[in-house]
């Protein structure tokens, strides 16, 4: 299956880890967004929203990383451990995935991402949203080893991708002890972590370059 991605993208890194957990091989096609490769006609035919990641599986194109993750585990999972069939367990996983998209990852994009692109951080209100997102996640993880239930699921993998992104921009995760505990364990047990970190190092290079340019 063809996988259009950027190694710096948290959504792309999520899918790389999910595929690793499932034992799937992805035919990776890196798109250079800064060079407009996502706007080429052949890619727009696959994804008119021209977003990454995008997966094409036997002619079926799907984008939005959390939708891709769920598709992969439902179609290719040897069991339902990453996305249980039980309606309540599945609902909790979906809630965490939506939390990641709409709250946690969104707070990164509004506060830190502008700095990586332009050297200008978001405003103080946006930073408060980062703190609030981690406070919520810390509550979710009180007395829990995983973000949604008693085992590793796609929600852990997606949130691991997001939380690790905050690490490379020097956000102090240690202020949230439950998150820090979960994060240390998730890095050890999640398949594909090394490739996730490899992609993050590219983002870290961009972040450090922006910091240096402001000195």
Curated annotation (Swiss-Prot):
Q: Which UniProt keywords apply?
A: Detoxification, Transferase
Q: Where does glutathione bind?
A: 9, 50-52, 64-66
- Return the EC number: 2.5.1.18
Q: Which reaction is this enzyme known to catalyze? A: RX + glutathione = an S-substituted glutathione + a halide anion + H(+)
Ranges of residues in domain GST C-terminal:
86-207
The family database entries (Gene3D superfamilies) matched by this protein are listed as:
1.20.1050.10, Glutaredoxin (3.40.30.10)
The record's listing under Pfam families reads: GST_C (PF00043), GST_N (PF02798)
GO CC annotation: cytoplasm
Q: What InterPro entries does the entry give?
A: Glutathione-S-Trfase_C-like, Glutathione-S-Trfase_C_sf, Glutathione_S-Trfase_N, GST_C, Thioredoxin-like_sf
* Disulfide cysteine pairs (residue numbers): none
- One biological-process term from Gene Ontology? glutathione metabolic process
Keyword Membrane recorded: no
Q: Where is the GST N-terminal domain?
A: 1-80
Similarity field: Belongs to the GST superfamily. Delta family.
Described function: Conjugation of reduced glutathione to a wide number of exogenous and endogenous hydrophobic electrophiles. May be involved in detoxification.
Complex and partners? Homodimer.
Name under which the protein is recorded: Glutathione S-transferase D4
Q: Which organism is it from?
A: Drosophila melanogaster
Q: What is the lineage of its organism?
A: Eukaryota, Metazoa, Ecdysozoa, Arthropoda, Hexapoda
């Amino acid at each position: 299956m063809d996988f259009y991605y950027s190694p710096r993208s948290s959504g792309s890194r999520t899918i790389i880890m999910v595929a690793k957990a499932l034992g799937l091989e992805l035919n990776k096609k890196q798109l250079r967004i800064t060079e407009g490769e996502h706007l080429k006609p052949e890619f727009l035919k696959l994804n008119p929203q021209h977003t990454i990641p995008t997966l094409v599986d036997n002619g079926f194109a799907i984008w939005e990383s959390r939708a891709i993750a769920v598709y992969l585990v439902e179609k290719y999972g040897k069991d339902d451990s990453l996305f249980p069939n039980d309606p309540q367990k599945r609902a909790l996983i979906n809630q965490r995935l939506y939390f990641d998209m709409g709250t946690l990852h969104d707070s990164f994009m509004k506060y830190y991402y502008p700095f990586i692109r332009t050297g200008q951080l978001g405003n103080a209100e946006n930073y408060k949203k980062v703190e609030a997102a981690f406070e919520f996640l810390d509550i979710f993880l009180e007395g829990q080893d995983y973000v949604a239930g008693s085992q590793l699921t796609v929600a852990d993998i997606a949130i691991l991708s997001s939380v690790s992104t905050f690490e490379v921009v020097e956000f102090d995760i240690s202020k949230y002890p439950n998150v820090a505990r979960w994060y240390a364990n998730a890095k050890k047990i999640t398949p594909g972590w090394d490739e996730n970190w490899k992609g993050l190092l590219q983002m870290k290079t961009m972040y450090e370059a922006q910091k240096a340019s402001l000195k």
